[in-house]
Design a protein with these regions (language model features):
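Glycine-rich phosphate-binding loop of ATP-dependent small-molecule kinases
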Residues: 1-199
Length: 199
């Protein structure tokens, strides 16, 4: 099974991605986690990523594409994967399509978590304070929300046109969101998609 999870910063993608990955026994691949892990590295690429993330902008397509493509070739992705934080732009959609086509794979479903913008700001400020995440400052949050609206939101239209978009209300308790998410995926599976349940 090949899944994407999308939504604005603070929508709870990471939390839900872990639950989805466990349920379907596939790896959850987060570009954000991969890039944050580069903070402790002293390479030119790591320094570039650190500066970009501190400003609230996204890492350039070419760098992100290379990291994701290499990760999707790993053995644990043979049964499928859940991508969190990729693709973010239309060129990345095209790149991912090409990578998947080479392996005769396709996206089965794109999960979109919808959350009120005011709720998102509160979530991110709380997360930044408790987790010590430097990229969760008010300025960076505003920048990421604008970038999401300008660049990432149009991807939902692409996946909606392809018939693979599964929209889920991301407001509320984590367990309630998870329940809605699996109900939506089960409904999609019942409509003849390629989704197959896990544990």
């Amino acid at each position: 099974m090949h899944l994407l999870i999308m939504g604005p910063p603070g929508a709870g993608k990471g939390t839900q991605a872990v639950r989805i990955a466990e349920h379907y026994q596939i790896p959850a691949i987060s570009t954000g986690d991969m890039f944050r892990a580069m903070r402790g590295q002293d390479t030119p690429l790591a320094k570039q990523v650190q500066e970009i993330m501190a400003s609230g902008a996204y890492v350039p397509n070419d760098v992100t594409n290379q990291v994701v493509a290499e990760r999707l070739l790993a053995d644990d992705c043979a049964r499928g994967f859940l991508l969190d934080g990729y693709p973010r732009t239309l060129p990345q959609v095209d790149y991912l399509d090409g990578v998947l086509d080479e392996g005769a794979r396709a996206i089965d479903a794109v999960i979109s978590l919808a959350v009120d913008p005011d709720e998102l700001v509160g979530r991110l400020l709380k997360r930044g304070a408790s987790a010590g995440r430097e990229d969760d400052t008010p300025e960076a949050i505003r920048t990421r929300q604008k970038v999401y609206v300008d660049e990432t939101a149009p991807l939902l239209d692409v996946y909606r046109q392809r018939g693979v978009l599964v929209e889920v209300d991301g407001l509320g308790e984590v367990d309630a969101v998870t329940k809605r998410l699996f109900a939506a995926l089960d409904e999609r599976a019942g409509s003849g998609s390629a989704l197959v349940g896990g544990s």
